[in-house]
Structure formats: structure tokens, C-alpha cells
Amino acid sequence: CDYHFRLTPKQRISIMTDEFEEWFVDEQMKVAVDFPGYDLKQKKARQTTGEEEAVTVGLAKINHLPFVLAIMNPYFMMGSMGQVVGEKLTLAFEEATKRKLPIIVCTASGGARMQEGIYSLMQMAKISAAVQAHHLAGLLYITVLTDPTTGGVTASFAMQGDIIISEPKAIVGFAGKRVIEQTMKEKLPDDFQQAETV
């Protein structure tokens, strides 16, 4: 149909892989953040999605060929990147490096999770360091940009893939279109921040 469609990690796993074994599900990765309403927002996201966090990672296979797969969930707090997301992605890259496997990351994010402040921004450097170690080991990293891929995710690991592909007309950018229009006091083109124009 030449257009993107937002999918959950489970949906994406079912169409992308023959086998999938999820990692880091039993880990008690919790963050203590004193931001008003944050606990309630996380609880609601868990109830709505049936997921613990905004990323699912694990070992996948296509035609018996293994690779590490990480899929961000746009339905869990808009796929925002906090400390748990950063830790799971970092561990995924480290495990891929240790096992000498390629990794595919399907990005979908509104950016850094504002409720976690500077700790969410630190995940950009943390994940990027793990990406670099994987790269220096001579291993393949493929990024699949899905709708939306914005903010700190775009500014870090989303654009570090050896191969970067995108869903048609997916929103890809750093700051949101409205923020840029308000700052520049100009109307931007309709196709601004579509994958085809990035």
C-alpha cells in the first residue's frame, strides 16, 4: 500500500521472524523516578499494551539464521526512551557482540522520556557506545525506521546502522514539525520529516 502502519512488537515479530526468544523479561528493571503521575502513566501503558516497557529484544531466526532483534513499541508511552529501554537496547547490542551476531532494530519513538530527565538523555550515549563496540567487532547493524522515529532516538542509535531502511512515509526527524514551525515562524511542507525526504 506504499504506506507505514504502526505495529506492536508481537505483530512485527510474527511477520519478520520464523522464531523468536525474548530476552530480559525476568529482569526486575524498574526505575525510581519522583515525577508526578509517572508511576500511574507507566501502569496504564502496561495495562493497555500487555508489555512491561517500550522495547522488546531477543534472539530471532529467519531460515534458521540467527540475529538479535529489538523492536520499539509506539503504543507504550509513544516508544519513549527511558532508562529501562536504554538498558535493554544496550544489553541487546552487547549480547549481539558477544555472540558475533547481526542485529536489527525497529525504531518507533517520540524520543527521550521526559519524566526521567537527564537519565533518559544519557541513554543516547550509552546505547551509542554499545553500537560502536558492535561495529568495531565487524558485525552488521540494520535499522528499520518506523513511524514515528524522532527525538533522541533519531539523534543516536537510529541513524548509526550500517544499513538504514524505512517504512514508506514514516515520520523521521529530531524536533516535531509544530515545534520547528513555531520556532521558525514558517509553514513547513506537508512531506516534511517523511522518510523519503530525510
Language-model regions, residue ranges each:
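Charged, low-complexity, helix/coiled-coil-prone segments
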Residues: 21-43, 63-78, 98-105, 134-147, ...
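N-terminal-biased segments
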Residues: 38-48, 87-88, 107-112, 156
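Cleft-lining beta-strand/loop regions that shape enzyme active-site pockets
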Residues: 55-135, 142
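Intrinsically disordered, low-complexity segments enriched in small/flexible residues
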Residues: 1-51, 59
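Conserved catalytic cores of soluble enzyme domains
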Residues: 107-197
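Short, exposed beta-strand "edge-strand" segments with a Pro/Gly-rich flavor and a Y/T-containing core
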Residues: 1-7, 78-80, 189-190
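Glycine-rich, charged/polar anion/phosphate-binding loops
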Residues: 53-56, 159
